[in-house]
């Protein structure tokens, strides 16, 4: 009997996070909706821990989980390698430290089925959109609307996905590997070639932190590199200068926690990204933006309240009274 093409491929690039991967896969196989319509791709970037043991264990136990190991570490090119292994109708990336929620897999499959005839580009943005919070489904007609809606979250690995045939025509997939943001260019190519997309913003996973966050230069990647990737699309007239200006403000707003911890209250216990030339990078992009000056002047005040007083004083006090979850839900509904 001929093998049926999977409906959905979930592609997990991983490196030296064996226990995180084990936790992730154990969760996936327990979910309602985990069946032959779902293919799991594990792309091991030549890990030196026991990632191979974990991957092979689950792939032997479940035929629809496929484990691949790179002969050498190929850095961020592993993201495209993971997608290249996928055979599903719709293929998407998932971080190795992202646990799909109990109803999440059913949700993903239902959305794919809804769109499988028209093949409109779709992205699962996991309740990350802060520019249009009240809309759980956002239809974007071009790159400008896509950037306006998603902004900094375009860089999120788990937000990227594509119909298999659309992925097949993405050019130069590893062009921006050194920038650590290949996925941004992939999304820009797809949205511009197919005249828009649909963003599904319902939360479908929750992340967990397997260790200290560290690695690249935070603002060099998320500011310098992001806008370097955007530039060719600006030059072609696919992204308006007005969109760039608005997006830069959205980026700055999104990175308020990082600004506070880099310049005012270092949290080196769990956040150890390279911060070399952070102010220089921000200055080069924002010296003409009044919001930048307001943000830097007021950061000690809103930062102390949001990231010190609330978690260390307000939250414990409300927990004692049994009111924290109620308060959090009320605030979330009003947003």
Sequence positions of predicted segments:
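Conserved donor NDP-sugar-binding/catalytic core segment of glycosyltransferases
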Residues: 99, 103-137
């Amino acid at each position: 009997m001929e093998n049926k093409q999977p409906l959905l491929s979930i592609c997990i690039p991983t490196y030296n996070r064996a226990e995180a991967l084990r936790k992730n896969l154990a969760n996936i196989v327990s979910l309602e909706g985990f069946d032959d319509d779902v293919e799991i791709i594990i792309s091991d970037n030549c890990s030196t821990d026991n990632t191979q043991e974990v991957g092979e264990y689950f792939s032997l136990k479940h035929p629809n989980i496929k484990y691949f190991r790179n002969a050498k570490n190929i850095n961020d090119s592993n993201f495209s390698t993971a997608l290249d292994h996928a055979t599903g109708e719709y293929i998407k990336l998932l971080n190795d430290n992202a646990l799909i929620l109990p109803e999440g897999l059913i949700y993903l499959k239902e959305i794919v089925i809804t769109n499988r005839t028209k093949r409109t580009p779709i992205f699962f943005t996991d309740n990350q959109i802060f520019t249009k919070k009240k809309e759980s489904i956002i239809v974007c007609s071009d790159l400008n609307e896509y950037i306006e809606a998603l902004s900094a979250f375009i860089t999120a690995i788990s937000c990227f996905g594509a119909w298999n045939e659309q992925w097949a025509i993405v050019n130069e997939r590893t062009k921006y590997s050194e920038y650590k943001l290949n996925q941004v260019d992939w999304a820009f190519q797809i949205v511009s070639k197919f005249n828009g997309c649909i963003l599904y913003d319902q939360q479908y996973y929750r992340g967990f932190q397997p260790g200290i966050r560290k690695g690249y230069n935070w603002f060099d990647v998320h500011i310098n590199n992001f806008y370097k990737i955007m530039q060719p699309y600006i030059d072609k007239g696919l992204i308006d200068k007005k969109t760039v200006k608005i997006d830069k403000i959205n980026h700055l707003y999104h990175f308020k926690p990082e600004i506070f911890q880099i310049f005012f209250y270092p949290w080196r216990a769990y956040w150890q990204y390279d911060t070399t030339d952070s102010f220089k990078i921000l200055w080069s992009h924002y010296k003409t933006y009044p919001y930048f000056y307001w943000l830097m002047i007021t950061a000690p005040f809103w930062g102390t309240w949001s990231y010190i007083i609330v978690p260390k004083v307000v939250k414990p006090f409300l927990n004692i009274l049994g009111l924290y979850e109620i308060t959090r839900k009320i605030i979330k509904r009003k947003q």
